[in-house]
Amino acid sequence: MHWKDEGYLLSKINYDENSIIIEVFTLEHGKCTGMVYGGSSRKQKRNFQVGNKLLLNWRSKNVNKNGYFTSELI
């Protein structure tokens, strides 16, 4: 499954060395949780501050499972 939407970052949790788990509120899909690989790197860290508006791409193997986000700051 794949979707693209705009949303606001509600929270983030550090996971492993370079990854984070984020919770976002999107316009079409509501509240969603997923992982961002490399989210705690120097280049990506500034994008993931609580309250930022993001353009999100979400991918998952199953609709009911947590997916993986890639994002851009709007």
Annotate each language-model stretch with its function.
Residues 1-74:
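A surface-exposed, charged beta-strand/loop segment in the N-terminal or early-internal portion
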